[in-house]
Amino acid sequence: MRTSILSMLALGAAAVSAAPAAAAAPAELVERGSSCTFTSASAAKAGKKSCSSIVLDNIKVPAGETLDLSNLKSGTKVTFKGETTFGYKEWKGPLIRFSGKNIEVNGASGHVINGGGASWWDGKGTNGGKTKPKFFYAHSLDDSTITGLNVKNTPVQGFSVQADNLVLDHITIDNTDGDKTNGGHNTDAFDVGESTYITISNANIKNQDDCLAINSGENIIFTGGTCSGGHGLSIGSVGGRDDNTVKNVTISDSTVSNSDNGIRIKTIYKAKGEVADVTFSNIELSNIAKYGIVIEQDYENGSPTGKPTTGVPITGLTVEKVTGSVKSSGTDVYILCGSGSCSDWTWSGNKVSGGKTSSKCKNVPSGASC
């Protein structure tokens, strides 16, 4: 239904003459009907509402500025072309911002969005050192799609998703340049919060933190992903925010390699919230350094305490066909639950090996194994 609505909007937009664009130098804007090609961030910001189709052509975003595609008119299509780059400045970002309804964002053949992360990387991420800009805010980007983007070297976190009914398909993030000493840190690929009906499919991620982190939200799908170099596929940390519910999530048919963790759920010590009806299915792990499967209810200030609490129950969890290898120095499975706060779990077809068997699991629910 959404596809047909978008098609009707596009046909309607083509029949209507565009409103005059804000003044811009000829080199910065080429406008044909309601189709616009922008070659500067300032021209895009000034003229975006006059266009139903936008091409961002080799834009060099000035230091400390956002490539601002917020509040687009409904039905707008935006294409990244060539290389998009960003000047260096210590600030919080974001480097790119999109919002609107029925928006289509895509990348032309051969394009790259180069975050220039090496200019900021110092091995500390958001925990100190240089102030680093977040990369891409998809906030209030509803009933929309982001497809086929090629991203390189985000300074810290990649896509921040806070939206309703958003599809992100075939997103590539390559942060392998950050694997060096004092390189990238906290380079999460997708951080999802306060969102509903989000689908992330066919992602190809190489980074130094979570491939996926769902902090809150409902009806979320992650499928067909390839994750390497980071911290794996994560729910949480859950708790301590305005929205502390994660519900109806499916993470499936994906691979995690050369990462600290395979799959994990972490909830905040003494916080309140809920993790319900989460499924991990058909996940292949390889060369995992710390934990193949880790579920713990003891996080405080970003680190485990070893003392689980019960304020964020984990119920209706399904872990099935999670298989693969952990390094000998790692742990295959670790489950640390509060008394009675993990229940109604389904655990089947899982085979994680190569690491140690934990002696510290606690309150493991019926059916699960540790």
UniProtKB/Swiss-Prot annotation:
GO biological process, one term: cell wall organization
PANTHER family linked to this entry: ENDOPOLYGALACTURONASE B, POLYGALACTURONASE
Keyword Glycoprotein: yes
Residues in PbH1 repeats: 163-194, 195-216, 217-237, 246-267, 275-297
Active site: residue positions: D209 (proton donor), H231
Main location: secreted
InterPro entries: Glyco_hydro_28, Glycosyl_hydrlase_28, PbH1, Pectin_lyas_fold, Pectin_lyase_fold/virulence
Protein source organism: Penicillium olsonii
Protein name: Polygalacturonase 1
Disulphides: C36-C51, C211-C227, C337-C342, C361-C370
EC numbers, comma separated: 3.2.1.15
Sugar attachment sites: N248
Catalytic function, reaction form: (1,4-alpha-D-galacturonosyl)n+m + H2O = (1,4-alpha-D-galacturonosyl)n + (1,4-alpha-D-galacturonosyl)m
The entry's keywords: Cell wall biogenesis/degradation, Disulfide bond, Glycoprotein, Glycosidase, Hydrolase, Repeat, Secreted, Signal
One Pfam family this sequence matches: Glyco_hydro_28
Example of a GO cellular component annotation carried by this entry: extracellular region
Family: Belongs to the glycosyl hydrolase 28 family.
Residues annotated as signal peptide: 1-18
Cell compartment(s), UniProt: Secreted
Top enzyme class: hydrolase
Superkingdom of the source species: Eukaryota
Molecular function in Gene Ontology: polygalacturonase activity
